[in-house]
Amino acid sequence: MQCPYCQHTDSRVLESRSTGAGRSIRRRRECLSCKHRFTTYERIEFVPISVIKRNGQSEAFDRSKILRGMVRACEKTTVLPSTLEAIAEEIEAQLQQKPKRSITTAQIGDLVLHRLRQESEVAYVRFASVYRQFQGVDDFIETLSHLQDNAEQANLWIQTLNEDEESEDLTSPSVLTPSAN
């Protein structure tokens, strides 16, 4: 490891600790040339997940986008920021475990909706209104009426998504989609 002070390439490890729930290692090092101490972090590098947007374009997965959307949906609710951080981390971990390295924004939205519904129905409806692009009051009314009716269907779809790793069909119809009237 190169010393940030003198750029010498030899250092020794003084201390190592696991951090971030075992996802990274913090190492305290000492340069063998100038004796300065510095800290390095080692973490697993994941194969990037590609997100296919509604317009067909593809971009790298960005967990902060999920978090921003959930924070806006949960404003003035009892859902804690730490809970939202945990949900975003859980969704990212779930996606990292999948053998397929691409997912649609609709599927990510469904995963977020599923978790938000467990935390707050208000946050669920707020997120759904943006994610599903509600056009009017009828879309809200329909979603509210489907909130209880389709709970079982949503849970089954999420369970199928989690279990079906070999023949993963990432074009499953979304649940709770307001119909165009």
From Swiss-Prot:
Disulphide bridges, residue numbers: none
This protein's UniProt keywords: ATP-binding, DNA-binding, Metal-binding, Nucleotide-binding, Repressor, Transcription, Transcription regulation, Zinc, Zinc-finger
InterPro entries named among the record's database cross-references: ATP-cone_dom, NrdR-like_N, RNR_NrdR-like
Cofactor note: Binds 1 zinc ion.
ZnF (unnamed) residues: 3-34
Top-rank lineage group of the source organism: Bacteria
Keyword Translocase belongs to the record: no
Pfam family, one: Zn_ribbon_NrdR
Residue stretches making up the ATP-cone domain: 49-139
UniProt-recorded Gene Ontology molecular function terms: ATP binding; DNA binding; zinc ion binding
Example GO biological process: negative regulation of DNA-templated transcription
Swiss-Prot/TrEMBL cofactor(s): Zn(2+)
Similarity section: Belongs to the NrdR family.
Function: Negatively regulates transcription of bacterial ribonucleotide reductase nrd genes and operons by binding to NrdR-boxes.
Protein name: Transcriptional repressor NrdR
Originating organism: Picosynechococcus sp. (strain ATCC 27264 / PCC 7002 / PR-6)
